[in-house]
Every structure is written in C-alpha cells, then in structure tokens.
C-alpha cells in the first residue's frame, strides 16, 4: 500500500492535467492561476511540490455542473477498493480533492460468452485422485470452475503391443536381483510388457590369449606376488596369464667408478655411520660411498678482531650467561658477540619542561609507574 501511495504522488499533476484536456464544456478565455501546493504524507519520506490549477469561473456554469454530476453518478455504479478509498480519504485530509473519480480508470470486467462444454467421448478418462481432491477442496470454499478439467487431460494413445523378443540359445536368464525385482512387482500386481532378458547382451566368446614367452631374464615373482596368487587360488580364482611377464628384468648396468679420495674428504657423520651399519645388518650394501656427496668444509680465514673503545659496553647479563652455557658444552664462538651490540649514543639531556598553571599532575597510573621504576633503581629525568 505504501508503494502505491508513493507512486501516486508524481501522477497527481498528470491526472489534473488530463481532467482539463478531457473536459467537454467550453468557456470564454479566462486567466489561469497556478497555486503551488505542498504535500507531506506519513507514507512518503519527503514532501512533494505540485501545481494545482484553480477552478474556472465561467458564465456557462450549467455545463460544468452537468459534467460533475455525471461523474458523480458514474462513481455510484462501481465501488472503489479499500486501498483507493483510504487514499482518497488521506488526500482529502490534506486538502487535496481530485477533479474526477478514479473509478473511471478501472475498466469494467469484460462480458465474455461462456465457453462451450467439452465433448465427452469414450476415450475421456476421469480425473485422477489429486484433481478430484483439489476440486472438492475448492468446492468447500465456494469456488466452482467454469469448465471441466478433464478436457485438458488427453486420452491415452492406443499403441499396438510390442512384438515379443526373439529367444535364442545365447540368451541367458535374468540375474538374481532382476528375478527378485520382477517377483516383487508381480506381488503388487505389476507385470512388465516385455521380458528384460532381451536388454542383457550375451557374453562375447573371445579367444584365449596366447601364453607369454619365457626366457632366461624372466625372474620369479616376488614374495608378495606369490602370496597374492596363493590367496587367490584358495578362493578359486586362477589368473589367465602369469604376472611375471609384466615385471621387466633388472638392467645390467656397469658398476659406478669408485670416488676419488683426497685429504679434504672427511668421514661420515654419526647419523650416516649408523644408517650404513643398519643397512648392512639387513644385507643392503650401497654401491658407492656416501662421503663423496658431503662437500668438505671451506677453509675461510678467521675474522678480524673488533676494535674496542671506551664506548663499548660489556655484554648484558643474558649474553654472558649464553656464552657461559655454550662454553660448558665445548662451544666457543669464533668472534666476540660484543661487536654486534652498538654502543649507547651520547645524547644531550633534554631541557626541563616549562611549568605553568595549565600543566596538570600525572595521573595515578603514571605516578605508580614512576614509583615502581624508582624502587628498581631507574630514575626518569623527564616527566612523562
């Protein structure tokens, strides 16, 4: 309703203009005054401005009164809907009265002739159960359809029965699932029109594959494959061909040359030694030494000692404890860690702040923070 009211406001000016254009009476030339009217409605978020034309004051007032009387009589024949009645009442409360009734914009319902009754014949089947229940439900609410719905349901075509399938020796019987399905349908009175066996093609008679060629390079199946074939044979499954033909023989590659040993070659680390020993216990011997893959450590020159000066401060307590912990485990750093800690800059002390009347004291949290720092020997020279 709100959308209808909001959309009607822009059309009020056009409706008033249409009243002027469609008027049938004639008047002498008169002066027309336009009065701007402000419209504000609780159904519209903002006010709208329209221009309303004042009524004509013509000498021939009989024609104008006759036109208004005929319009009032035509409005008696058709009652406006509830929404439009409320809209006219709402506009009348704001001093807006339309020049003619809005009922003339609602065309009357056309008087179409009733459709002819459908032709009933023997092929017309009755309505299904859902349609019967729907018509009964509508009849309970006083709704009666103008025509029968059975005419919209075309009759079932009289198609000829399909020809029976040709039975031959290759046709195999239905499987167990299909047999049970047909038996279940027969218990409910459903009989298929044709046999389902014709849709199952017979198994093709393919020739047996040729046996594989055995040669000296063919190695026996591994233990996993032997156990798999034995497990399948226990369940009555015999493969048509041997699986050994799918396993290519191992290539006879030449042994790699031994690596060149030099003075820079260091022995294998402890993890690699234990790995090689673990593989040797299981009969696995690597073809080459793994030491050749570990490059020797480069002989880099020792770094220059850092320049110590007066600004160099000693290591912090954490760094000193770290170096002591590493020294207990036999780890000595190659260079001093103090060179990575830049000295503290010698900045000038800041100027004291200017005290004035607007300077307010520190809040309670800042006072407690400064007191806590003073207890630990930290003195702040500048007020926060």
Swiss-Prot record:
Q: In terms of domain of life, where is this protein from?
A: Bacteria
sequence repeats (start-end): 96-142, 143-189, 190-236, 237-283, 284-330, 331-377
What organism, scientifically named, is this protein from?
A: Escherichia coli O157:H7
Q: Give UniProt keywords alphabetically.
A: Host cytoplasm, Repeat, Secreted, Virulence
Gene3D superfamilies with a match to the protein in the record: TccP2/EspF(U)-like (6.10.250.3330)
Q: Is this entry keyworded Metal-binding? A: no
The record's subcellular locations are:
Secreted; Host cytoplasm
Q: Pfam families per the record? A: EspF
What is this protein's function? Required for efficient pedestal formation in host epithelial cells during infection. Acts as an intermediate between Tir (via host BAIAP2) and host WASL/N-WASP. Directly binds and activates WASL/N-WASP, which stimulates actin polymerization and leads to the formation of actin pedestals at the sites of bacterial adhesion.
What is stated about domains?
Answer: The N-terminal 21 amino acids are necessary and sufficient for translocation into the host cell. The C-terminal region, composed of several highly conserved proline-rich repeats, interacts with the SH3 domain of BAIAP2 and BAIAP2L1, and the GTPase binding domain (GBD) of WASL/N-WASP and WAS/WASP. The N-terminal translocation signal and two proline-rich repeats are sufficient for triggering actin polymerization, but each additional repeat gives higher activity.
Kindly state the subunit structure of this protein. Interacts with host BAIAP2 and host WASL/N-WASP. Can also interact with host proteins BAIAP2L1 and WAS/WASP.
Q: Where is this region: Disordered?
A: 247-266
The name on file for this protein is: Secreted effector protein EspF(U)
Q: Which gene encodes it?
A: espF(U)
Instruction: Kindly list the GO CC terms recorded for this protein.
Output: extracellular region; host cell cytoplasm
- Where does it primarily localize? secreted
Spell out the Pro residues composition-biased ranges. Answer: 248-260
Q: Which InterPro entries match?
A: T3SS_EspF, TccP2/EspF(U)-like_sf
């Amino acid at each position: 309703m709100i959308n209808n009211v909001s959309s009607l406001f822009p059309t009020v000016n056009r409706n008033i203009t249409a009243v002027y254009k469609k008027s049938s009476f004639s008047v002498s030339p008169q002066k027309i005054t336009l009065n701007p009217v402000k419209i504000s409605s609780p159904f519209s978020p903002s006010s709208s401005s329209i221009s309303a034309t004042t009524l004509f004051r013509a000498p021939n007032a009989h024609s104008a009164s006759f036109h208004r009387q005929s319009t009032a009589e035509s409005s008696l024949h058709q009652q406006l809907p509830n929404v439009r009645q409320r809209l006219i009442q709402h506009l009348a409360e704001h001093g807006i009265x339309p020049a003619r009734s809005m009922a003339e914009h609602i065309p009357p319902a056309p008087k179409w002739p009733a459709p002819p009754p459908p032709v009933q014949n023997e092929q017309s089947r009755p309505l299904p159960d859902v349609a019967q229940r729907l018509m009964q439900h509508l009849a309970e609410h006083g709704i009666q359809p103008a025509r029968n719905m059975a005419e919209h349901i075309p009759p079932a075509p009289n198609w000829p029965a399909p020809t029976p399938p040709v039975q031959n020796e290759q046709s195999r019987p239905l499987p167990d699932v299909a047999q049970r399905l047909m038996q279940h349908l027969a218990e409910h009175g459903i009989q298929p029109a044709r046999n389902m066996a014709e849709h199952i093609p017979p198994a093709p008679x393919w020739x047996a594959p040729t046996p594989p060629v055995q040669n000296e390079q063919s190695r026996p199946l591994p233990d996993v494959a032997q156990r798999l074939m034995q497990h399948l044979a226990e369940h009555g499954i015999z493969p048509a061909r041997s699986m050994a033909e799918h396993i290519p023989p191992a290539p006879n590659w030449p042994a790699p040359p031994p690596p060149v040993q030099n003075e820079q070659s260091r022995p294998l680390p402890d993890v690699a030694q234990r790995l090689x020993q673990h593989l040797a216990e299981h009969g696995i011997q690597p073809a080459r030494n793994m030491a050749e893959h570990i490059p020797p450590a480069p002989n880099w020159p020792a770094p220059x000692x850092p320049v110590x000066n007066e600004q160099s401060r000693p290591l912090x307590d954490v760094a000193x404890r770290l170096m002591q912990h590493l020294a207990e485990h036999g780890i000595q750093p190659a260079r001093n860690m103090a060179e990575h800690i830049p000295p503290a800059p010698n900045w000038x002390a800041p100027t004291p702040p200017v005290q004035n009347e607007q300077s307010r004291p520190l809040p309670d949290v800042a006072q407690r923070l400064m007191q806590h720092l003073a207890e630990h020997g930290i003195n702040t020279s500048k007020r926060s």
